[in-house]
Amino acid sequence: MSNVIENLGKLDRKVTLAIPKAEVEKEKQERLVRLSKTVKMSGFRPGKVPMKMVEKQYGQQVEFEVRFDKAARKFFDITKEQDVKVAGQPKFEIKNEGVGEDEVAFDATFEVYPEVTIGDLSAAEVTRTGTEITDAEVDKTIDILRKQRVHYHARGEAGEHGDGGADVAAQNGDRVTLDFVGKIDGEEFAGGKAEDFPFVLGEGRMLPEFEQAALGLKVGESKTFPLAFPEDYHGKEVAGKTAEFTVTLKKIEWAHLPEVNDAFAKSLGIADGSVEKMRADIRENLEREVKRRTHSMLKDQVMEALLKASELEVPKALIEQDQERLVEMARRDLEQRGMPNAKDMPIPAEMFAQQAERRVKLGLILAEIVKANGLEAKADQIKAEIEDFAKSYEDPKEVMRWYYGDQQRLAEMEAYVLENNVVNFVCGKAKVTDKKVSFEELTAEGNQQQA
């Protein structure tokens, strides 16, 4: 039976589409006439190729296209008329049995969107983390900024930044420059030698044996020590062997951190050099980071709560579509990282199956909860979020123009606001426990979740 949508399962449907052959033939001839005006064929001027030759060359292909185009249009009309919400793309198969002589027919199989049932959210439990930015956190951030602007001066020098010392030994925090050479059984080996090699003592960037050898040395002094390479060392020629290294200290420099004054404040973009304003800006940035992290942590809990509270079947077609999107995202990421031939790299979609199913499921749940509770993002909400984001930039108005000048960026902010609305709605229903942590604890917890 044509035009009747059959139920094949929870989400699977089928409809038979019958199309009169006369309609197919009429549109086929119209397309061939249009094609004949542009088609090129040896021995004929453009637009002068006889219709019989055009039909012989292209008739079968054009008829195939017309049949499927008409089937697609009819499918769209039927599902729209019957208010059927199609998930993904239908699959068309030519139907041969039980078809009248004057018609062509297709079986279209497809999936529909599921009914989403969201359970009692009052049983959900979420933890809302809060953090207060103290003066100590501001001080720690200033120390980090100072260390990022560190410069070094040779020990034993006089002058404004000289330490006045003469015969000094290397200590933690100093930047040392040394030569080293390693030997195995008295012979040098590849990669075991360097000259004028700098590193900062105590940062842990060098092997512990090198750090210990350099500590306490004075310029011009040398020290020899053994270094055992592990069995699984990447250099096969030295793996499992013990080398004898000799280091010779050539320079010791001490770390000079900039003072916290107007010059330092200006280097951070404070035009008038106000240290007080600099501290206020740092506090504001830290509070913005706290808001971002705590919101992300709360959002993740809310999404998990919604997944647990909801019942729905997920259309396979939507999962497959999202798998392909994730494959393309992974490929673009590899390209941006400089991976050669990333465009042609085979990435199996199956590896994203679970992630895609979760994303699709959440998308369906969010769409339902937003629609049922009027949680759509309002224009004033979007504007307020953009204004808050723009505050951290030198020219907030330019940032506002940047957002409103691109529909994609605006859509991303709209999605963010919509998520906020859902989070606030769920928190209004669920059992929420407030938890206070330090900024350091918050950072550590956030990093663990990302790992």
From Swiss-Prot:
Its EC number is 5.2.1.8. One of its GO terms (molecular function) is ribosome binding. Coiled coil: none annotated. It catalyses: [protein]-peptidylproline (omega=180) = [protein]-peptidylproline (omega=0). It is found in: Cytoplasm. Residues 173-258 form the PPIase FKBP-type domain. One of its GO terms (cellular component) is cytoplasm. Its main location: cytoplasm. It holds the Pfam family Trigger_N. PROSITE patterns: FKBP_PPIASE. GO terms for biological process: 'de novo' cotranslational protein folding; cell division; chaperone-mediated protein folding; protein transport; protein unfolding. Keywords: Cell cycle, Cell division, Chaperone, Cytoplasm, Isomerase, Rotamase. Belongs to the FKBP-type PPIase family. Tig subfamily. Involved in protein export. Acts as a chaperone by maintaining the newly synthesized protein in an open conformation. Functions as a peptidyl-prolyl cis-trans isomerase. Consists of 3 domains; the N-terminus binds the ribosome, the middle domain has PPIase activity, while the C-terminus has intrinsic chaperone activity on its own. This is Trigger factor. It comes from Cupriavidus necator (strain ATCC 17699 / DSM 428 / KCTC 22496 / NCIMB 10442 / H16 / Stanier 337) (Ralstonia eutropha). The gene is tig.
